Each structure stands twice: as structure tokens, then as C-alpha cells.
Amino acid sequence: MRRHHLLGLLRRAAASSTSAASSRAGPHPSLHAPGPLRNGGSAPRFFSSRGGAGAASKGLGDDEVELYSLLLGVSIGDEGEASSRGPAASRGGRRGRNSKRQPPRSRFDGDGVGCSKDGKLSWGYSSFQGRRPSMEDRLSIKSTTVNGETVSLFGVFDGHGGPRAAEYLKKHLFKNLVKHPKFLKDTKLAINQTFLKTDADFLQSISSDRYRDDGSTAVAAILIGNRLYVANVGDSRAVALKAGKAVPLSEDHKPNKKDERKRIEDAGGIVVSDDIWRVDGILAVSRAFGNRLMKRYVKAEPNIQEKVVDEGLEYLVLATDGLWDVMRNEDAVSLLKAQDGPKAAAMKLTEVARSRLTLDNVTCIVLQFHHGKSTNSK
């Protein structure tokens, strides 16, 4: 898409908030104001869309709505409350050689907020592109009911070699998981099998060698009643604030770890370092979705932790490595304590990552557990 055409679409989107609504459903109706959903149902009463993509998309054609969805890279489930801010325009020019170093600017950033129907959980998310030439992070949020059980699912996906794998996970991972026949009875088994099957499905969907290097990490939180499951592949990370302390709930999959290196080498791969340890001198994570040429030893098998949600659990952060590259777990939870609600916390985390000159895309979701207190989803 040529730059002048892209700018034209954005200008039209900004100017069209009072136009008549398009007669055709956009590709992401769940980002719009309450109304008919793609599956034929109606948006629940607690679903709301305030401003941003929801308001600006009124009167847009399919291509403009698709543009908003692509820029934000956000998937919100049919039964989740969310609002999102539209993509920000590029700000600032190229930094001169002798100019003062400035934090990287983000061409496309988005943020949003939501809460569960029972009021026990609220969440906020924030993301920005940073210095990378493209945005390869994606996230997915879904709040639904399975056999009468309230289920909330959250995922952050960090693409590499292109956005295709992360986009596929955003669309399919949780859809596949809730359909697993043992999702409620043996959730850990269901998560493990769904991750592996979704990886196989993605590889089958990319027939062209053009996408053979597309891959993605993933970190997901699945809440079923008072049981919390955290699953991760790669180096996107989950960190909880519990009883005032940082508690890691995921394990970074790095090729220099003794067990991971042995597994890779036993399968025929090599691990080498050029300041960063890499599989076959290419990939800086030892597990990932996609990466077809390395699939023998770069698996999508997740580490899974199961926890009981008790009153000590206050917050949970899911974030891509663009955040963790410049922030310790303890720094992240300290920032959470000073913020007013999960959206403010998510935005603060990404702002600090940008101020610390992270070189990568950054996306994070912050969950706040209320334990009978009034919900604050700011």
C-alpha cells in the first residue's frame, strides 16, 4: 500500500465519525459499538466501545476497517468488554547524527480496557511499534462461558520473520482451546495439545517457502473459576504481583539453557553465540510456533503453571520481550502498585519501555484481580 494511500485512509477514518454506518459488517465487528456479531448473536450489554477504532470506523468501508484492525493487531472476544484507541500517526522525523538521543517513536500504538461479567477481573492492554520497521506483536482477549463455567483467556504473541504466525495465533489459538473436549476436565493436557495442534495447523497453512521463517512466541493466561493457568512458548513472559512481590509464572525458552541446548543438539541443531545465543545462528529462542525449517528442534510445546487465585494475587502482567529486555520483573510490579487500574498500568509499562529505548515492539496485558472489591477498569 503506497504511503499517500495509507495516509488518505487514515484521514478519511478520522473525518468520518459522523458518516452513515456502512451496510456491510467489517472484518472485526467486535471492535465496533454494541450490535450484531459475526456469529449471529448480539453483543452483551456489558460490551462497550468508547472512541478510537469503535467510533472512528463508523461509515468506513471494509478496507478502512481492515486497516484499523491491521494497525492495532488486537482481537477482542465476543463476550469481553473493551475499548481501543486508534493508531497514532507517526511523530517526529529522523534523528540527526548529532542530535540529542530521543525515545523511539511509535507509528501505531493502541490501548484498551475491559472487565469480566462477574466483576472479579479487569484488564488493560497497551502496545507500540517502537523502532522496528513493522509491528509483529499481536494480542488476543476472550471472555466467554464454557458449559456454564466463566472462562477468560489472554494471550500475547511476538512474531518474528513476519507477522503471519502471530496473526494466526491471535485468530485461532483460543478458538481451538475452548473446543478441546478436555478443556475443563484436564486443562493442562488441553493446553499442551492445542498449542502443538495449532502450530501444526499454521505450518500446514503456509504452503509457500516465502513464509518458512515466520514464527512467534506466546504467553497465555487462562482463568477458569478460581484456577489460573499460564502457558508460554519462547521468551514472552508472565509475572504476577502477589503479596507485594514479583512472582514469575513463565520460563524463558533460551537456547543457551542447559536442558534446551541438549534437546536442540540431540535433534540435530546447533547453538552458537554472536553476543546472543541463537539456534542455528539464527533464532534467539529455543521454542516457537512456526519456523518450519527448524521445526525438528524448535518446538511449540509450552511450559504450563497452574495456580489457585487467592487474595494475595493482585496483578498479572503478560508482555513481549520488548518490555523485559529493558525492565526487571521487580521494576514492573513496582510500577503496577503506583497506577490507578490495569489500563493505566499497561500504558505506564510501555511508556517506560519506550523511555528506556527498547529496540523491539512492545505489547503487554495487565490483569487486576478484585477479590470482591469494586471493579476499577481504568
From Swiss-Prot:
Mn(2+) 1 binds at residues 158-159. GO terms for molecular function: metal ion binding; protein serine/threonine phosphatase activity. Residues 1-59, 79-115 are annotated as: Disordered. Its cofactor is Mg(2+); Mn(2+). GO terms for biological process: signal transduction. It comes from the Eukaryota. Residues 122-369 form the PPM-type phosphatase domain. It is an enzyme of class 3 (hydrolase). SUPFAM superfamilies: PP2C-like (SSF81606). It catalyses: O-phospho-L-seryl-[protein] + H2O = L-seryl-[protein] + phosphate; O-phospho-L-threonyl-[protein] + H2O = L-threonyl-[protein] + phosphate. Residues 7-26 have a biased composition (Low complexity). InterPro entries: PP2C (IPR015655), PP2C_BS (IPR000222), PPM-type-like_dom_sf (IPR036457), PPM-type_phosphatase-like_dom (IPR001932). Its EC number is 3.1.3.16. Residues 92-104 have a biased composition (Basic residues). Belongs to the PP2C family. This is Probable protein phosphatase 2C 55. It comes from Oryza sativa subsp. japonica (Rice).
